[in-house]
Amino acid sequence: MHRDAWLPRPAFSLTGLSLFFSLVPSGRSMEVTVPTTLSVLNGSDTRLPCTFNSCYTVNHKQFSLNWTYQECSNCSEEMFLQFRMKIINLKLERFGDRVEFSGNPSKYDVSVTLKNVQLEDEGIYNCYITNPPDRHRGHGKIYLQVLLEVPPERDSTVAVIVGASVGGFLAVVILVLMVVKCVRRKKEQKLSTDDLKTEEEGKTDGEGNAEDGAK
């Protein structure tokens, strides 16, 4: 077959390229990483971590960030911090001066710190990120749980005792199996030796009888 026979026509190539570029998105979506639930002690300071992965360098002129708060999943969102060329703290009445930006957009970190956490701060915190030319806006959601006291540590003594008992039992079983195996092996070796000895004695007796008959 001639080489030109299987080459695509120019018109077909242009059509195929047009279709290809129409299907390929102009930007790639980012991934936002946040903890699903964050439990903190009442009156303490806590960091609400929010980081993202992007294939593009952060351009502060195009990059944008919104932090919002919700009392419940069906409640309306209240914006309390944003980034437009610079950090803008909206200082909502519920937070006052207790919110502080502790991230670095250039390092793909847009975390915030909430100081002197109160019971009323419990709820949902949303982190919205836009980093053109990424087409899709990134979103992270954190549920903040405020505790009145530190939960008691789990007593691991029982688990340790059970683990030690099971481990000891298994060790004994393994030891017994090894002893039984050794005893069986010794018996088998002894039987093999006895059989071989009997066979040799039989051969010796046979040779002796043959010599007597010849005489």
From Swiss-Prot:
Give all residue intervals belonging to the Ig-like C2-type domain: 32-154
Q: Which residues lie on this side of the membrane: Extracellular?
A: 30-157
GO molecular function: any one?
voltage-gated sodium channel activity involved in cardiac muscle cell action potential
Disordered: region residues: 187-215
Q: How does it sit in the membrane?
A: Single-pass type I membrane protein
What InterPro entries is this protein classified in? Answer: Ig-like_dom (IPR007110), Ig-like_dom_sf (IPR036179), Ig-like_fold (IPR013783), Ig_sub (IPR003599), Ig_V-set (IPR013106), Myelin_P0-rel (IPR000920)
Q: Where is the composition biased (Basic and acidic residues)?
A: 189-215
Q: In chain numbering, where does the site feature Binds SCN2A fall?
A: Y56, R135
Where does the record say carbohydrate is attached? N42, N66, N74
Q: Where mainly found?
A: membrane
- Extract the Pfam families matched here: V-set
Which parts pass through the membrane?
158-179
This protein's GO CC annotations: axon initial segment; node of Ranvier; plasma membrane; T-tubule; voltage-gated sodium channel complex
GO BP annotations, alphabetical order: cardiac conduction; cardiac muscle cell action potential involved in contraction; cardiac muscle contraction; gene expression; membrane depolarization during action potential; membrane depolarization during cardiac muscle cell action potential; nervous system development; positive regulation of sodium ion transport
SMART domains in the cross-refs: IG
Q: What ranges does the Cytoplasmic topological domain annotation cover?
A: 180-215
**Where is the protein situated, by its record's location annotation?**
Cell membrane; Cell projection, Axon
Q: Which residues form the signal peptide?
A: 1-29
Listed A to Z, the keywords are:
Cell membrane, Cell projection, Disulfide bond, Glycoprotein, Immunoglobulin domain, Ion transport, Membrane, Phosphoprotein, Signal, Sodium, Sodium transport, Transmembrane, Transmembrane helix, Transport
Please list the residues that carry the modification Phosphoserine.
S192
Q: Which residues carry this modification: Phosphothreonine?
A: T204
Sum up the protein's function in the record's words. Answer: Regulatory subunit of multiple voltage-gated sodium (Nav) channels directly mediating the depolarization of excitable membranes. Navs, also called VGSCs (voltage-gated sodium channels) or VDSCs (voltage-dependent sodium channels), operate by switching between closed and open conformations depending on the voltage difference across the membrane. In the open conformation they allow Na(+) ions to selectively pass through the pore, along their electrochemical gradient.
Q: Which family does it belong to?
A: Belongs to the sodium channel auxiliary subunit SCN2B (TC 8.A.17) family.
Self-association or partners: how does it assemble? A voltage-gated sodium (Nav) channel consists of an ion-conducting pore-forming alpha subunit functional on its own that is regulated by one or more beta subunits. The beta subunit SCN2B is disulfide-linked to the pore-forming alpha subunit. Interacts with SCN1A; regulatory subunit of SCN1A/Nav1.1. Interacts with SCN2A; regulatory subunit of SCN2A/Nav1.2. Interacts with SCN3A; regulatory subunit of SCN3A/Nav1.3. Interacts with SCN5A; regulatory subunit of SCN5A/Nav1.5. Interacts with SCN8A; regulatory subunit of SCN8A/Nav1.6. Interacts with SCN9A; regulatory subunit of SCN9A/Nav1.7.
Protein name as it appears in the record: Sodium channel regulatory subunit beta-2
Species for this entry: Rattus norvegicus
